[in-house]
């Protein structure tokens, strides 16, 4: 079977490969081109353009873009059914002509399309209807006269089943972490001795902590399917009368789990800073996290960097003026400048481009690491989706929009496939993922207990929190 190129090779700087389509295709029914670039088409014509025949195989860029965006218009199992039907029709035509050479030409192309679908969008096949169609078509290919494809079909199915099994295992771990999560204050009330344990007793080296954070980031990134970026913004297609499949398509559990990790890390940072009783210990903890954040920046782990900065900027932490007075903040000021939201995060975007360029020319796994500030990536995709229509006035699919969407998502796909080069420290990872953190109210209470309220509003809140959380007046 032909080898598929890496995602980074799929799109040029303009958003898509400009040399995919020959001028002879300009007159293809239902597809509209400009300067040989596919701009729009009817949904039916785009589906036909996806399916290979004896003389044609779609470019990988088109396959990825259409499989990614088609779920805005139809459920993947509906697309799979149409693709299977067209593939079977092509096979029948070849068989009807009695030309075995034609069969030999088309079978590997169909198998390659199915392989690309299962490799890039494996989560589509959690749907039994998808898996049934895939097995039916794969069986048809493997049981024909051409037995040479049986091994390739088996490899494709085994690889898909492994990926789905790994996803199920990952989801079980997430569910277990979620079910055992408790509030830090509750733990301290029942086990006061646990207050002695903090992040610095578990991992005294900020560089090691930054590396372990990168492990968590890359693992969670790896489980996000590219389709989740589209499914997060699925809305009812006005030309679609099936109301039920809209809600079915909105599956974004791994994306949501990653956003929850960002929030957890921010709260963990704030908890670790607010928990120490002594001012010098709080100041030391702030400086520790500044060093962790700086190393995250050097690694290219912008998501952990931003989570740490967010935690340090939470009100219960930022109000600790006496503590901050003891902190050397020069390094923190530089990091805040890098992640400054002004001018649409211009400084961060510049740093991200630099990291992405470094990744392309990398000589080591460490240099390949690019972990974007995830919430901003989601926001960019959201505004791209909101800023352009999915369908043109004539009912055609606005494919120009989806080239750009696919460009952004394919870049993410390249980054998420990087293997973490750092040694795993299970003790540190366990602490980061499972140690209880303070709720927002508990953070404020700890902050007021460390440095008393400065005005009447804070005094009233302190009294209220002591009463509700500690049962004290």
Curated annotation (Swiss-Prot):
GO MF terms held by the record: guanyl-nucleotide exchange factor activity
Keywords recorded for this protein, A-Z: Endosome, Guanine-nucleotide releasing factor
Induction: In vitro, up-regulated in peritoneal macrophages by GPI-mucins, bacterial lipopolysaccharides (LPS) and poly(I:C). Small induction, if any, by IFNG alone. Induction is maximal 12 and 18 hours following LPS stimulation (at protein level). Also induced in T-helper cells activated by phytohemagglutinin. In vivo, up-regulated by infection with protozoan parasites, including Plasmodium chabaudi and Trypanosoma cruzi. This induction is dependent upon IFNG, MYD88 and TICAM1.
Main location: other
Domain annotation Ras-GEF: ranges: 205-453
Tissue specificity comment: Constitutively expressed in brain, intestine and testis. Low constitutive expression, if any, in heart, lung, lymph nodes and thymus. Up-regulated in heart, kidney, liver, lymph nodes, spleen and thymus at day 20 after infection with Trypanosoma cruzi. Not detected in muscle.
Alphabetized SUPFAM superfamilies for the sequence: Ras GEF (SSF48366)
InterPro entries assigned to the protein according to its UniProt record, in alphabetical order: Ras-like_GEF, Ras-like_Gua-exchang_fac_N, Ras_G-nucl-exch_fac_CS, Ras_GEF_dom_sf, RASGEF_cat_dom, RASGEF_cat_dom_sf
Any Pfam family the entry gives: RasGEF_N
Gene Ontology biological process terms, A to Z: small GTPase-mediated signal transduction
N-terminal Ras-GEF domain ranges (all copies): 34-161
Entry keyword Transport: no
Subcellular location: Early endosome; Late endosome; Midbody
A Gene Ontology term for the protein's cellular component: early endosome
PANTHER family: GUANINE NUCLEOTIDE EXCHANGE FACTOR, RAS-GEF DOMAIN-CONTAINING FAMILY MEMBER 1B
Subunit-level organization: Interacts with CCDC124 during cytokinesis. Interacts with Ras family proteins.
Biological function: Guanine nucleotide exchange factor (GEF) with specificity for RAP2A, it doesn't seems to activate other Ras family proteins (in vitro).
Name of the protein in question: Ras-GEF domain-containing family member 1B
Source organism: Mus musculus (Mouse)
Lineage, uppermost ranks: Eukaryota, Metazoa, Chordata, Craniata, Vertebrata
Gene that specifies this protein: Rasgef1b
């Amino acid at each position: 079977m032909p080898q598929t190129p890496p995602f980074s090779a799929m799109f040029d700087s303009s958003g898509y490969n400009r040399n995919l389509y020959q001028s002879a295709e300009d007159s293809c029914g239902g597809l509209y081109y400009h300067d040989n670039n596919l701009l729009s088409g009817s949904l039916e014509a785009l589906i036909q353009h996806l399916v290979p025949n004896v003389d044609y195989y779609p470019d990988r860029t088109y396959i990825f873009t259409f499989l990614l965006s088609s779920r805005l218009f139809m459920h993947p199992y509906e697309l799979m059914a149409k693709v299977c039907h067209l593939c079977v029709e092509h096979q029948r035509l070849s068989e009807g002509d009695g030309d075995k050479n034609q069969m030999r030409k088309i079978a590997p192309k169909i198998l390659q399309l199915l392989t690309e679908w299962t490799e890039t969008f494996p989560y589509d096949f959690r749907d039994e209807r998808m898996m049934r169609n895939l097995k039916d078509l794969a069986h048809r290919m493997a049981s024909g006269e051409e037995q040479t494809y049986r091994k390739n079909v088996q490899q494709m199915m085994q690889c898909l089943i492994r990926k789905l099994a790994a996803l199920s295992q990952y989801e079980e771990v997430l569910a277990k972490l979620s079910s055992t999560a408790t509030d830090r204050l509750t733990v301290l009330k029942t086990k006061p001795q646990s207050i002695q344990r903090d992040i610095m007793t578990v991992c005294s080296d900020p560089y090691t902590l930054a590396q372990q954070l990168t492990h968590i980031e890359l693992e969670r990134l790896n489980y996000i399917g590219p389709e989740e970026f589209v499914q997060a913004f699925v809305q009812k297609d006005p030309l679609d009368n099936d109301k039920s499949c809209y809600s079915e398509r909105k599956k974004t559990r791994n994306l949501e789990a990653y956003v929850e990790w960002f929030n957890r890390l921010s709260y963990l940072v704030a908890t670790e800073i607010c928990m120490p009783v002594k001012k010098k210990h709080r100041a030391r903890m702030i400086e520790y996290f500044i060093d962790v954040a700086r190393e995250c920046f050097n690694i290219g782990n912008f998501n952990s960097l931003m989570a740490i900065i967010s935690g340090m900027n939470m009100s219960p932490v930022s109000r600790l003026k006496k503590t901050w007075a003891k902190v050397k903040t020069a390094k923190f000021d530089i990091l805040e400048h890098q992640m400054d939201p002004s001018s649409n995060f211009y400084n961060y975007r510049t740093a991200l481009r630099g990291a992405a360029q470094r990744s392309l020319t990398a000589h080591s796994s460490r240099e390949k690491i690019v972990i974007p500030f995830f919430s901003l990536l989601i926001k960019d995709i959201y505004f791209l989706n909101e800023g352009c229509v999915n369908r043109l006035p004539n009912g055609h699919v606005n494919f120009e929009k989806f080239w750009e969407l696919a460009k952004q998502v394919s870049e993410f796909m390249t980054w998420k496939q990087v293997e973490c080069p750092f040694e795993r420290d299970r003790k540190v990872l366990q602490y980061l993922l499972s140690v209880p953190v303070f709720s927002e109210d508990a953070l404020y209470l700890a902050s007021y207990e460390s440095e008393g309220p400065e005005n009447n509003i804070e005094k009233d809140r302190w009294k209220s929190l002591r009463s509700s959380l500690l049962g004290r007046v």
